[in-house]
Regions:
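Active-site/binding-pocket entry motifs
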Residues: 17-18, 131, 154
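A residue-level signal for conserved active-site and pocket-lining positions in enzyme catalytic cores
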Residues: 15, 76, 151
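Aromatic- and carboxylate-lined catalytic core of secreted/periplasmic carbohydrate-active enzymes
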Residues: 41-96
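Conserved alpha/beta catalytic core and glycan-binding cleft of carbohydrate-active enzymes
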Residues: 1-63, 106, 117, 124
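Carbohydrate-binding surface patches
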Residues: 59-60, 66, 93-127
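A residue-level signal for beta-strand positions that form part of recognition/binding surfaces
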Residues: 8-9, 99, 111, 145, ...
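C-terminal beta-strand-rich structural cap/linker in extracellular carbohydrate-active enzymes
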Residues: 142-159
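Solvent-exposed beta-hairpin/edge-strand motifs
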Residues: 127-138
Length: 159
């Protein structure tokens, strides 16, 4: 239930989560780098605005431990800007697996967002023809099956 003309703020961490909850851990420390990246893909590619808490992109800038993710966030945000404008509606799809799926669509566009939230390679069966527009991680399309490596994601053009 969205308010017309307003965008949702999507985040894995903020000043509250690193001071009051999760034993003051950031997403990369709490979940591990690859799991956190998959969660950021999911949140970044659905409707709304992705909020990256200071230090999540480069922990060293705040004297914290963790992998520098500036290139990952650059690619994630570039994909959102190019393929998933906030003018598109969102429909969440039931997959019966560890693959998160949603359709982002408008009058002339239908895009499928897939993110593998597991540590195993996972297939997703398409219900319509599609082509991969961009992927973060190893993603292959063969016939009507998209295979996603652990914690990877893709945006597909349907039709």
């Amino acid at each position: 239930s969205s308010v017309s003309g307003k965008l949702k703020l999507r985040f894995l961490g903020n000043h509250d989560t690193v001071t009051w909850t999760f034993d003051a851990q950031r997403a990369q420390t709490l979940y591990g780098t690859e799991k956190a990246k998959a969660l950021w893909m999911m949140l970044g590619w659905i409707d709304g605005v992705l909020y990256i808490y200071q230090g999540d992109e480069d922990p060293a800038a705040y004297h914290l431990e963790g992998e520098n993710l500036e290139a990952f966030f650059t690619d994630l945000i570039a994909a959102k800007r190019e393929y998933l404008p906030n003018t598109l509606d969102t429909a969440y799809l039931q997959t019966g697996s560890a693959v998160f799926a949603c359709r982002r669509f408008g009058e002339q566009t239908s895009r499928l967002v897939l993110v593998n939230l597991s540590d195993t390679e996972t297939p997703y069966t398409l219900t319509a023809s599609a082509s991969v527009l961009t992927a973060l991680g190893n993603v292959t399309l063969a016939g009507n099956t998209v295979t996603l490596s652990p914690y990877s994601g893709a945006i597909l053009q349907e039709g």
